[in-house]
Every structure is written in structure tokens, then in C-alpha cells.
UniProtKB/Swiss-Prot annotation:
Family the UniProt entry places it in: Belongs to the CNF-like-inhibitor family.
Quaternary structure, from the entry: Forms dimers or higher order oligomers in a temperature-dependent manner in vitro.
Keywords: Disulfide bond, Phospholipase A2 inhibitor, Secreted
The protein's name: Phospholipase A2 inhibitor gammaCdcPLI
Single Gene Ontology MF annotation: phospholipase A2 inhibitor activity
Length: 95
């Protein structure tokens, strides 16, 4: 489970603090809005993995861990990503 915990305010052990670096406690690169946005905009087809650290599986995993706020979980990666745009729109409507 640790592999899917990124710098979103909580780490794999449940600490309520932001990571001090762009990496999570496992040393994996966290979701980055600039990186993700760039990759998403370059994607030829909707539904492709957002990046090597941001696949559909990881998005589902993060949603299950933090079901209350999908936009917070996915940080800045949602707005320009076809794969997750519908989920984000639904969440915003229900705010």
C-alpha cells in the first residue's frame, strides 16, 4: 500500500502532515500538477495512463483511501486529464 501513498497531506502511516519533499515516504515521485498536466496534454488518446506514477489503478487506490475528496487526492492532475475529468466534475457538482 505504501507504493500508492503520495505527497497529499498524509503518508502511509497516517501522519497528518505534508511531505517535506516531492517524494512520498517510499521515495516515489508524488503527483505533480505541472508534470501531470504536461503529460496529459501530450496524450493522443483519452483513457491512457496519466504518467508512470498516475495510472488509473493508482487513481482508484487513492480514491479508496481518501473517498471524501477526490480532487484533493489527485492534487492538480485532474483538470487537464481526460481519464479523470468526469470524476472531478461530479465531485465539484456535489461540493
Amino acid at each position: 500500500s505504501c507504493d500508492f501513498c503520495h505527497n497529499i497531506g498524509k503518508d502511509c502511516d497516517g501522519y497528518e502532515e505534508e511531505c517535506s519533499s516531492p517524494e512520498d515516504v517510499c521515495g516515489k515521485n508524488c503527483f505533480s500538477s505541472s508534470i501531470c498536466k504536461e503529460l496529459c496534454e501530450d496524450q493522443p488518446e483519452p483513457g491512457e495512463p496519466l504518467s508512470k506514477d498516475s495510472t488509473e489503478y493508482e487513481a482508484i487506490c487513492k480514491y479508496e483511501q481518501f473517498p471524501g475528496d477526490i480532487s484533493y487526492n489527485l492534487k492538480g492532475c485532474v483538470s487537464s486529464c481526460p481519464l479523470l475529468s468526469l470524476s472531478n466534475a461530479t465531485f465539484e457538482q456535489n461540493r
